[in-house]
């Protein structure tokens, strides 16, 4: 074993903030379906708490034995609209309470899967779940919700887009004492993936196994340090440096995933290669882009730098691990990235530039605060724009946006912890009302017909 590699890994962890962001156990709840809501909730609670009873303990053991920080232990479940749809209940808030109670019992950080997949239309259960989201997120601490409103094969469900804009507004209102924090636990997707370990968008797809272990890594600080050593070099060298660094980071993620899988006796699913920033200085995707040569993120060249970063991360990661999945790229959540926050405050980075950046990176408009009086129709337009980027480019896109109640442009919304703080950003003041009112479906793009 190469001593230099060992010392390099120790340095990456101690000085460059390398960590495993999450070990997420996916759990199928299909065998918990019951027409009696009370019985279904008992089955759900028992299945989750039994399946993941050792998850936190094993995570801590691996952290201690290997010296690798594991920030979060999480659970994802089969989309709840499928499970609860068998009942005759008119609200699924009690299901959310059951999930929250299970999460508290396990001691995990978050539980994802209060979700619905409505890219082509809504079932009765989907409609009830969507209408239940605001109250469900207001009365729970650890439950996360997501709704998939579009995909490349089906187009965009504009009725669902309009409904989700209203849901976001209502969620912000019900959690206004926390500056709309409920919206930080809610994601609207296009092309959602079934094996995502990251919150708030994780759910356990129906094509997945009974239980599965998915791991998400995090290493923006490591990539930035590596690039500091090649200042002034060509883009060829920059891309190769990022690729080699991503390889090392992913190897560590695979080690943790395999070890967790073995100890929990649960199959290993995937490693998600995503570079996930934190609010800490030196753990920022924006700082990587600035190290590549931008005075500040948001200036011209930002999208090209981000595209190269995203691609190089994927290339390095797939060489390190046979099973790569989830979102796998670079996250650009404004509130969780110190460099992004600074760029917004200085005026270098605006909402329109962020939309452009989402065309070439991992997800979409993420953890962005906007004025609390932003109309639902404007939010619907933002969701539709992001969904269109995902559907046309055959990639995952998402919107996790917080219309902060009582806040205006320039105010700072404090969330704390990994969610950080978000400067309230300006949105276009022109109306999208007539656009949002149309409803129906935007058809799938011509290049989706590949059979």
Swiss-Prot record:
Family according to the record: Belongs to the UPF0210 family.
Protein name per its UniProtKB record: UPF0210 protein Cbei_2352
Pfam family, one: DUF711
Classification via PANTHER family: UPF0210 PROTEIN MJ1665 (PTHR37560:SF1), UPF0210 PROTEIN SPR0218 (PTHR37560)
SUPFAM superfamilies xref list: PFL-like glycyl radical enzymes
UniProt subunit comment: Homodimer.
Record's signal peptide: none
HAMAP family: UPF0210
NCBIfam families: PRK05313.1 (NF003700)
């Amino acid at each position: 074993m190469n001593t230099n590699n060992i010392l390099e890994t120790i340095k990456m962890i101690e000085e460059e903030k390398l960590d495993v962001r999450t070990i997420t156990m996916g759990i199928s709840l299909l065998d918990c379906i019951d027409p009696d809501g009370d019985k279904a909730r008992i089955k759900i609670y028992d299945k989750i708490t039994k399946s993941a009873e050792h998850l936190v303990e094993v995570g801590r053991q691996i952290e201690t034995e290997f010296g690798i920080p594991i920030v979060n232990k999480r659970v994802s479940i089969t989309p709840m609209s499928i499970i609860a749809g068998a009942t005759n209940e008119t609200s699924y808030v009690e299901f959310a309470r059951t999930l929250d109670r299970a999460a508290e019992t396990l001691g995990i950080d978050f539980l994802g899967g209060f979700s619905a997949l409505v890219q082509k239309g809504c079932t009765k259960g989907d409609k009830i779940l969507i209408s239940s989201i605001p109250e469900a997120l207001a009365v729970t601490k650890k439950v996360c919700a997501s709704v998939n409103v579009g995909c490349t094969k089906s187009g965009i469900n504009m009725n669902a887009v309009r409904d989700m804009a209203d849901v976001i507004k209502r969620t912000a209102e019900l959690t206004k004492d926390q500056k709309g924090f409920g919206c930080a636990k809610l994601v609207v997707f296009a092309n959602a993936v079934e094996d995502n370990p990251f919150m708030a968008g994780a759910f356990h797809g129906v094509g997945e196994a009974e239980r599965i272990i998915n791991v998400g890594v995090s290493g923006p600080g490591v990539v930035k340090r590596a690039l500091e050593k090649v200042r002034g070099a060509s883009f060829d060298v920059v891309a190769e440096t990022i690729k080699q660094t991503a390889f090392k980071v992913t190897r560590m993620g695979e080690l943790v995933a395999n070890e967790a899988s073995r100890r929990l006796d649960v199959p290993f699913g995937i490693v998600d290669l995503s570079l996930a920033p934190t609010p800490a200085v030196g753990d920022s995707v924006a700082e990587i882009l600035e190290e590549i040569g931008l005075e500040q993120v948001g200036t011209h060249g930002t999208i090209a730098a981000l595209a190269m970063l995203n691609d190089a991360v994927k290339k390095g990661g797939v060489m390190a691990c046979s099973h790569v999945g989830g979102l796998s790229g670079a996250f650009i959540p404004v509130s969780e990235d110190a460099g992004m926050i600074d760029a917004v405050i200085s005026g270098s980075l605006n909402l329109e530039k962020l939309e452009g950046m989402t065309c070439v990176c991992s997800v979409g408009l993420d953890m962005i605060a906007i004025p609390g009086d932003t109309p639902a129709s404007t939010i619907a337009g933002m969701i539709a724009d992001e969904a269109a980027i995902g559907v046309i480019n055959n990639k995952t896109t998402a919107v996790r946006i917080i219309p902060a109640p009582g806040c205006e442009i320039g105010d700072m919304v404090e969330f704390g912890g990994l969610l950080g703080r978000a400067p309230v950003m300006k949105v276009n003041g022109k109306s999208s009302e007539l656009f949002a009112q149309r409803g129906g479906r935007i058809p799938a793009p011509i290049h989706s017909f590949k059979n």
